[in-house]
Amino acid sequence: MKINNIIRAFILCLAIPLLIAEENITVDDLLKAMDANLYAKSQVYTSKMIVHGRRSSRTIEFRSWVVGIDKAFTEYLSPPREAGTKMLKNDDKLWTYSPQTDRVIQISGHMLRQSVMGSDMSYKDMMEEQPLLEMYKATLEGTEIINNRIHHVLLLEAKITGLSYQKRRAWVDAEYLLPMKEELYAKSGKLIKSTSMDGVKKIQGRWFPTRFIFRDELKRNSRGTEWIIDEIQFDLDIPDSRFSKALLRK
């Protein structure tokens, strides 16, 4: 215990020159840097979501095409019972297609609060994927050492209406400029969800996490949901036809 405290104190001492050098960096600069790492002109990726239930876990593999923050198309690849399921986001509209029923359903209203495939993520979480700087104003609460790495602690408060999370607290790695963990709060101050990320790699000039963990804090004994990026490419040219509603049935 004492050795760990000494190590943390030593790291903080080493960090002081770095923090002084960064004193002109504003919290908005931090948000811009995070957004620059997490968002791109376009993304194409293959990934899997591991949903941990109380008794067992299941893995869903899918491939996604994303342009900016307004267009996304996802096709589920496995397991067999989920294969062929598709999801399309176009601006503020979201549709899903199930090959079992051969139906296209628009997800809206209260349905947006529903879980995606039994995971700890809701459809509204997906719809609110946009740059943090556009949604929140931030204040710097301090600096913490986590896993021997320096993190800026930011409090984010909503500056637009209608967000699921009125407040967020983020621990931003000082080198990666990524929110390595977050706590998401309701307007009442109640903790609703928590997230973390790891497996950070340099991909096409940006630091990017290859594993995300989401936990619904309102679910008793929640074991969380993992989202693992197997392969990702940024800034590819994706034709508009990829985001056609007609493609859901093909």
Features from the language model and the residues they span:
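N-terminal mature ectodomain segment of secretory-pathway/periplasmic proteins
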Residues: 23-100
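Bacterial N-terminal signal peptides that target proteins for export
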Residues: 1-10
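Acidic/charged, solvent-exposed loop-and-adjacent secondary-structure segments enriched in E/D, K/R, S/T
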Residues: 99-127
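A short, amphipathic edge element
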Residues: 27-28, 127-139, 189-194
